[in-house]
Regions:
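Acidic, contiguous internal or C-terminal segments within carbohydrate-active enzymes
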Residues: 1-31
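Residue-identity detector for glutamine
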Residues: 4-5, 18, 41, 92, ...
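Residue-level detector of short, conserved catalytic/binding motifs and their immediate flanks
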Residues: 6-10, 55, 88, 201, ...
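An exposed acidic His-Trp-rich patch
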Residues: 11, 35-52, 189-198, 277
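Short, surface-exposed secondary-structure junctions/capping segments
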Residues: 14-15, 44-48, 249-254
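Detector for glycine-centered tight turns/loop "hinges" at secondary-structure junctions
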Residues: 19, 62-63, 228, 269
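A contiguous, surface-exposed recognition patch within enzymatic or periplasmic domains that forms
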Residues: 21, 25, 30-156, 164-174
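Terminal accessory/anchoring regions of large secretory-pathway or extracellular enzymes
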Residues: 102-285
Length: 285
């Protein structure tokens, strides 16, 4: 899959005979058990087990988004509203064999799938379903496009799109860097008492404009959270590389999901795609 691609052109005409509460267009399924971002759920000798490690979106407004996948303890549904998306899909960005150590099914070779609308899809949302799993045999990830307009009996719907089965996204950005790793750990500073209720997030970025940025440039992380408190945020160049690393601590009470958002800036210039993450505190207890 590293050097091959398969293209499929889809042209669908739908004529519902009854009202449909949730019509999923261009559905994809996948499997995500555990990876760098949820090591606490490891139940196997292999370091990582997943067909894809993230949902990527290229919005109608031009924003590039990367959302790492989760293996929740209960079914989670998230919607990402958009108008006329340029594309979205499930990617396997981690291509290092030693991150999986599987010479039977070769998770490092699993394909990425990119959905490219070839017409205007209007208003709606990319919906992501994450289902609990404790084994690699279950497809527990689902994505699809959900139109905003109600689907009524007797209406007509037309959707055209192209499926790209590739190693990475077919239209990589030339203007922003991409997320390469998402890691979690205990909040605080080594050698000092660790505060309770805190989690450290470490996100690596690579490529794009970062190849031109010097390590002393004043790159800043822009972080936001739906609840809780952000502390100790910073960004630095990874020694010996052109990659940059952003990190921050999150302090939050309760077990409700927390939605996080981060990207890197230099002055008024956006350097990276947007990292979205849904932190599930209850999975760490």
């Amino acid at each position: 899959i590293k050097t091959q691609q398969i293209l499929m052109d889809i042209d669908a005409n739908l004529y519902p005979r009854q009202d449909i509460k949730r019509l999923g267009i261009a559905p994809l399924t996948s499997m995500f058990w555990y990876a760098e971002n949820n090591r606490h759920q490891i139940r196997d000798w292999r370091p990582e087990i997943h067909d894809n490690d993230g949902l990527t979106m290229w919005t109608g407004a031009g924003e590039r988004i990367w959302r790492p996948l989760n293996n929740p303890s209960s079914v989670m549904t998230n919607s990402f509203a958009d108008t006329n998306p340029k594309g979205f899909g499930l990617l396997q960005r981690d291509r290092a064999f030693y991150h999986y150590e599987d010479d039977g099914v070769f998770y490092d070779r699993r394909p990425s799938v990119w959905i490219e609308p070839t017409g205007e899809w209007g208003e709606g949302a990319i919906q992501l379903l994450e289902i609990p799993t404790d084994d690699e045999i279950h497809d527990n990830i689902v994505i699809y496009w959900l139109p905003k307009e109600p689907v009524k009996a007797g209406s007509e719907w037309h959707y055209a799109y192209r499926l790209h089965w590739v190693a990475t996204e077919p239209y990589p950005s030339e203007t922003v860097a991409r997320v390469s790793h998402t890691r979690l750990g205990n909040a605080g500073i080594p050698g000092q008492p660790r505060p309770k209720g805190g989690r450290k997030f470490v996100i690596d970025f690579e490529g794009g404009p970062l190849n031109e940025i010097a390590k002393l440039d004043k790159v800043k992380p822009v972080v936001s959270t739906s609840k809780g408190r952000i502390d100790n945020e910073y960004a630095l160049q990874v020694v010996g590389t052109k990659n940059w690393r952003a990190a921050f601590d999150l302090y939050v009470e309760g077990n409700e999901p927390v939605n996080l958002r981060l990207f890197l800036k230099l002055g008024d210039r956006t350097l990276t795609e947007t990292w979205l993450y849904q932190y599930l505190p209850f999975t760490y207890d």
